[in-house]
């Protein structure tokens, strides 16, 4: 996998990771990590015949930072500028968690650029927003503690499964990859942008635009409720896949994740249509 940092016309730096040849598939990662955390899954996707382009989001990885108070739409503007720089004007978009919320934003506002959307435990759906909504500052500490407890449960569940599926050498490689992918505390700005977001009208826009969509969601997700995945799929008329895992099941079993993404895309439409992306 090739890792590089490109500089946009406005001077903003963006970390870009690429692997494979074929239909372009843009992958957007989850909160607090970077594209590198998903390297095993992305490499497997390339083996399925995709040209994978994984971007470090603003405030993450090797990418620059946006000012405090920015929105998710601001983050997607950086994404689209980067793809313009790479001469990618239409692609399959897949995103996990925060990245899934960004895919929803792009698909709703720029449907001509999205050949298909694959949402992996995406930060989308009314149940998700109800779970993290900004406000009621008197209870903020309690809500923060509650979410932290859920996140710990989720991470432990996926982490145990990830270690269970790997041999000793693979375990060391996996832990090193996660360590290298963590983005410090800059991601807090992006977290606040997610708390202010409202994807429900965007999901309806995706449906109106006829964006082919697949939703893959962990049955035991403690961060984005399973019900949010169901409602996201219902609004967008998406194919839905329930996965026996937590919020980051694709890190625990990257081979399964890549195979499911490929299966979902083949289920949405013929391969000859997918290869028309770009």
UniProtKB/Swiss-Prot annotation:
The keyword Oxidoreductase applies. Its EC number is 1.11.1.-. Keywords: Oxidoreductase, Peroxidase. The gene is 59.2. Belongs to the AB hydrolase superfamily. This is Putative non-heme haloperoxidase. Residues 24-240 form the AB hydrolase-1 domain. The active site is at 97, 221. One of its GO terms (molecular function) is peroxidase activity. InterPro entries: AB_hydrolase, AB_hydrolase_1, AB_hydrolase_fold. It comes from the Viruses.
């Amino acid at each position: 996998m090739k890792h590089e940092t490109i500089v946009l016309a406005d001077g903003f730096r963006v970390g870009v990771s690429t692997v494979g040849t074929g239909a372009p598939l843009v992958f957007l990662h989850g909160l607090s990590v970077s594209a590198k955390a998903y390297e095993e899954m992305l490499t497997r996707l390339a083996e399925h015949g995709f040209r994978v382009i994984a971007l470090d989001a603003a405030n993450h990885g090797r990418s620059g930072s946006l000012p405090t108070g920015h929105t998710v739409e601001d983050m997607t503007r950086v994404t689209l500028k980067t793809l313009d720089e790479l001469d990618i004007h239409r692609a399959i978009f897949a995103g996990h968690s925060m990245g899934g919320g960004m895919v929803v934003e792009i698909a709703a506002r720029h449907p001509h650029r999205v050949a298909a959307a694959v949402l992996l435990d995406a930060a989308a759906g009314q149940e998700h927003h109800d779970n993290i909504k900004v406000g009621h500052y008197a209870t903020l500490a309690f809500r923060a503690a509650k979410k932290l407890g859920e996140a710990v449960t989720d991470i432990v569940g996926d982490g145990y499964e990830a270690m269970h599926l790997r041999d000793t050498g693979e375990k060391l490689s996996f832990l090193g990859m996660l360590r290298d992918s963590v983005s410090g505390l800059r991601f807090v700005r992006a977290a606040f942008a997610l708390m202010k977001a409202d994807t429900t009208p965007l999901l309806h826009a995706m449906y109106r635009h006829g964006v082919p969509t697949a939703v893959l969601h962990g049955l035991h997700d403690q961060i984005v409720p399973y019900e949010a995945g169901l409602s996201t799929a219902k609004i967008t008329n998406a194919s839905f896949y329930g996965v026996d895992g937590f919020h980051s099941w694709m890190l625990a079993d990257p081979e399964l994740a890549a195979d499911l993404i490929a299966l979902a895309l083949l289920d949405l439409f013929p391969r000859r249509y997918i290869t028309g992306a770009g």
